[in-house]
């Protein structure tokens, strides 16, 4: 996988809501965004890697579902998260 353990730990520490929080929507979306960013860079040099492109589409879909969930449950946390990650909307 592209994201190292140290990068994962840093992302979790930046977005966790409480100590030992690794499952909140914010953490999950941040980790997915990091993987999506890596794969996007990968496709700049490997344009014909269709197998990985399918994985990218699954990651984007999963992130969208988590963002929709967060928007439904707590709109303020949703807005804060998309600002921190620099996502559209």
From Swiss-Prot:
A GO CC term assigned to this protein in UniProt: cytosolic small ribosomal subunit
Keyword check for Iron: no
Entry GO MF terms: rRNA binding; structural constituent of ribosome
Keywords: Ribonucleoprotein, Ribosomal protein, RNA-binding, rRNA-binding
GO-annotated biological processes: translation
Source organism superkingdom: Bacteria
SMART domains assigned to the protein according to its UniProt record, in alphabetical order: Ribosomal_S15 (SM01387)
Record function comment: One of the primary rRNA binding proteins, it binds directly to 16S rRNA where it helps nucleate assembly of the platform of the 30S subunit by binding and bridging several RNA helices of the 16S rRNA. Forms an intersubunit bridge (bridge B4) with the 23S rRNA of the 50S subunit in the ribosome.
Quaternary structure (record): Part of the 30S ribosomal subunit. Forms a bridge to the 50S subunit in the 70S ribosome, contacting the 23S rRNA.
Entry similarity comment: Belongs to the universal ribosomal protein uS15 family.
HAMAP family tied to this protein: Ribosomal_uS15_B
Protein name (record): Small ribosomal subunit protein uS15
Organism, as annotated: Methylobacillus flagellatus (strain ATCC 51484 / DSM 6875 / VKM B-1610 / KT)
Name of the encoding gene: rpsO
């Amino acid at each position: 996988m592209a994201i190292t353990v140290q990068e994962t730990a840093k992302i979790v520490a930046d977005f966790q809501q409480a100590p030992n929080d690794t499952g909140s929507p914010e953490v999950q979306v941040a980790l997915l965004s990091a993987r999506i960013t890596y794969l996007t860079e990968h496709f700049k040099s490997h344009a014909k890697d269709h197998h990985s492109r399918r994985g990218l589409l699954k990651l984007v879909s999963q992130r969208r579902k988590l963002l929709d969930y967060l928007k439904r449950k707590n709109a303020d946390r949703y807005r804060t998260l998309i600002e921190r990650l620099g996502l559209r909307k």
